[in-house]
Design a protein with these regions (language model features):
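Surface-exposed short loop/turn segments
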Residues: 120-140
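Solvent-exposed coil/turn segments that connect beta secondary-structure elements
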Residues: 54-55, 88-89, 119-120, 149-151
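Short active-site neighborhood of thiol/selenol oxidoreductases, capturing the structured segment around
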Residues: 39-67, 81-84
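Thiol-/selenol-based redox modules, centered on thioredoxin-like
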Residues: 140-218
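Sec/Tat-exported extracytoplasmic proteins
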Residues: 71-75, 126-129, 133, 187, ...
Length: 218
């Protein structure tokens, strides 16, 4: 791992090498959801921040800006990282306006994805996760979730804070401080986890190649 990357990943405030799995094997994004740019968006093989902003965009716009500033601007450059927001159809123009504002604050928005669908389809998909929080009357929630490349929900479980057992499956976008601290740390740990696994696999491949070369020489 390059020294710059090592220093970046080492800045997480808690030193866990792995982010706990809260629940496993969640469903892929339904094909009926259409992205803003009509590109194909999938959860599989991506680290995903998943959110459901709802149809009251004017009221929750600040939450999206919090996400952009505190999370996306830090991690959007990783090719296997993405932000996926699912909201009711009919809000495309408002999201386009928000993306125009984002472009003044961020250099590259290619890993921001907004998907649109019918409210009942969104609620059906949301319920498959069995999250503790429910969607509101606008088919939205201020909470976002971290999914790994295998579509497992990640968070905090069993870590001690002031003598208490911590459980966290989501992050509140209303709180810029929570995104900046807890969520940023957790995304960083998950990215580091995959980088360490990649490095370990590369060492195995190099060792295997070396053995094969020695056998060929004989």
């Amino acid at each position: 791992m390059p020294i710059v990357a090592y220093m970046f990943f080492a800045t997480a405030s808690h030193n866990s090498l792995f982010l706990p799995v809260i629940s496993k094997n969640h469903a892929e994004l339904p094909s009926e959801f259409v992205s803003l740019n009509e590109e194909k968006v999938v959860l599989d093989k991506n680290i995903t921040v998943l959110g459901f902003p709802g149809s009251n965009i004017d009221e929750v716009k600040a939450n999206l800006f919090n996400l952009n500033q505190k999370i996306y601007n830090k991690y959007g450059g990783f090719k296997d990282f993405q932000m996926v927001m699912i909201l009711p159809d009919g809000n495309q123009d408002k999201i386009k306006a928000i993306m125009l504002e984002f472009r003044r604050l961020s250099n590259d928005l290619k890993n921001w994805h907004f998907l649109f669908g019918k409210p009942e389809a969104i609620e059906t998909y949301y319920n498959t996760f069995k999250f503790k929080n429910k969607l509101d009357a606008f088919t939205g929630s201020p909470f976002v979730y971290i999914l790994d490349k295998e579509k497992n929900l990640r968070g905090r479980k069993g870590q001690k804070i002031k003598g208490k057992v911590e459980y966290r499956e989501c992050y509140n976008t209303i709180s810029a401080a929570e995104l900046h601290n807890e969520m940023s740390d957790d995304v960083k740990i998950l990215l580091r986890e995959y980088r360490l696994a990649l490095k370990k696999n590369k060492r195995k491949d190099d060792f295997r190649d070396k053995i094969e070369q020695e056998v060929i020489k004989k």
